[in-house]
Design a protein with these regions (language model features):
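Interdomain "pre-motor" coupling segment immediately N-terminal to P-loop NTPase/helicase cores
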Residues: 80-127
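Primarily a LysM-type cell-wall glycan-binding module
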Residues: 1-13, 57-70
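A short helix-loop-helix "switch/interaction" segment in the helical subdomain of ASCE P-loop NTPases
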Residues: 338-352
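An amphipathic alpha-helix signature
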Residues: 5-6, 16, 20, 68-69, ...
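Short, Lys/Arg-enriched alpha-helical microdomains
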Residues: 20-51, 83-102
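A short, Lys/Arg-enriched interface patch at domain edges and termini
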Residues: 47-64, 394-398
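Walker A/P-loop NTP-binding motif of AAA+ ATPase domains
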Residues: 129-336, 448
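C-terminal engagement/docking regions of AAA+ P-loop ATPases
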Residues: 158-160, 348-354, 367-448
Length: 448
């Protein structure tokens, strides 16, 4: 019998939050544990039923107040190491030395070398990168699932009156994968995905009859279970400024959206707007009951960058591909090879990573065509050349986008993404101008 995570947690007598945190603490692939619409996989069901007592202990511990001393005594590890892990991963939850939410004794023990092989025995080897639905971002996946809970769990509406979202904004720097996550949301709640084309934003004449975005929305409202995706949401829904040239089409879209948004929940319609930043968006749009679900989409962290580099280098290659043989000869078919390069790619977007791998593939092919051997060395020289080429999008404007995004993510959801936000702050700091503190842009690119 297929069960969603909410139903299954009740059956186990373990909180849903604990199951989600457990998957993150033990670095399990989401696709090994949950289907795209958050149903429990057979593999995870078998593990959970056979280890129900362990999960209950994990659940009890997660919700129990404890100090670093308590954790140290329980797992026989130095208090200083435990405090360092907590400070690195949960910088926002210090409260007089007592920890509760999100702090698992078992999770810390696992990071410090505790033996939990019995867990991994159920899942075999890690799912190959090329077979994964997405790489990393477990924290973002579960944050989104929490935001979508009214869609996934009707009991929230029936017993608590919690409304489904009518509008969602996914926001983040250019190239961070906002459309990917919008499609992932549609998949998670089993809605059809429609991307609004630029032509549909304009009022045009067809057979002497004017058609508008309002008419387009009227047609969509006749459908059921639809995600409407609107790119450049921050530009289209911008608050009017004095002496600003008004884009009449954008104003029509804004007014039509505000007029119809109350109908969205009733008709099972959700509009997702994609924005670089939230500042400047018309306040009426962000009002409760409208676009009040805000989902930050971060550039990948260092580990995610290494995994993405390997994924993009091996994507669509068959087992006899020449490039794959060259990668294997250099041990570049494994994540450790890419860690040094990933370390240098501070605040790189997903798009920049793809640009890097495309550039590197071309350079490797050029060397192969010249030397006709699979024994080519993937040297630091060609890695650095590809890195420099892909960094062309790392402009002052992009870095300012990242800084604004960080400010907004910190204001809206620091409690859920504290470690990711602090890491990104440190990476951004490496680009800040040291000699010209008065500059308005405040960033430069270090050329090596």
């Amino acid at each position: 019998m297929i069960q969603n995570i909410s139903e299954f947690s009740k059956k186990l007598d373990v909180s849903e939050e604990s199951i989600k945190q457990f998957i993150q603490d033990f670095d399990l692939e989401i696709s090994d544990c949950l289907s795209p619409n958050l149903n429990i996989t057979q593999n995870f069901e078998r593990f959970a039923i056979e280890n129900q007592e362990f999960l209950k202990k994990y659940d009890e511990d997660l919700n129990k107040e404890k100090t670093a001393d308590d954790i140290s005594k329980r797992i026989h590890q130095p208090k200083e190491k435990i405090e360092q892990i907590i400070q690195d991963q949960f910088p926002n939850i210090y409260d007089n030395g007592i920890y509760k939410s999100s702090i698992s004794t078992f999770g810390i023990d696992n990071q410090l070398g505790g033996n939990y092989q019995f867990i991994y025995n159920y899942f075999g080897d890690k799912t190959e990168l090329k077979q994964r639905d997405f790489i990393g971002y477990r924290d973002l996946f579960f944050y989104i699932s929490d935001m979508l809970e009214p869609f996934l769990n009707p009991e929230q509406s029936e017993n608590w009156g919690i409304q489904k979202a009518a509008g969602i904004i996914v926001y983040g720097p250019p190239g961070s994968g906002k459309i990917f996550w919008a499609k992932k949301i549609a998949e998670m709640i089993d809605f059809d995905f429609f991307e609004i084309r630029k032509s549909q934003l304009k009022s045009i004449l067809v057979n002497d009859k004017k058609t508008s975005f309002d008419e387009y929305l009227s047609q969509i409202l006749k459908k059921d279970k639809v995600i409407l995706f609107l790119e450049n949401f921050d530009e289209i829904m911008m608050q009017r400024q004095e002496r600003q040239i008004i884009n009449s089409d954008h104003e029509d879209v804004k007014e039509s959206t505000l007029h119809n948004i109350e109908k969205f929940e009733k008709e099972n319609i959700v509009m997702i707007g994609s924005a670089k930043e939230l500042i400047g968006i018309e306040p009426e749009i962000l009002a409760p009951g409208r676009f009040d679900v805000l989902i930050p989409v971060f550039p990948p962290n260092k580990q995610e960058r290494a995994e993405m580099l390997l994924f993009n280098m091996t994507k669509n290659l068959n087992e006899n591909a020449t490039l794959l043989k060259i990668l294997k000869n250099n041990k570049a078919d494994q994540i450790p090879f890419w860690k040094e390069t990933a370390e240098k790619m501070k605040v790189f977007s997903n798009t920049m990573l793809v640009d890097f791998t495309q550039s590197l593939k071309k350079r490797i092919r050029s060397l192969y065509m010249k030397n006709k051997t699979e024994g080519i060395q993937i040297s630091q020289v060609i890695l650095d050349a590809s890195l420099k080429e892909s960094a062309s999008k790392l402009t002052g404007e992009y870095l300012n986008n990242v800084q604004q995004f960080l400010s907004e993510a910190e204001d809206n959801s620091y409690d859920r993404f504290a470690a990711r936000i602090e890491d990104l702050k440190q990476e951004l700091e490496t680009y800040k101008a040291k000699d010209e503190p008065i500059r308005t842009i405040g960033f430069h690119i270090n050329e090596e």
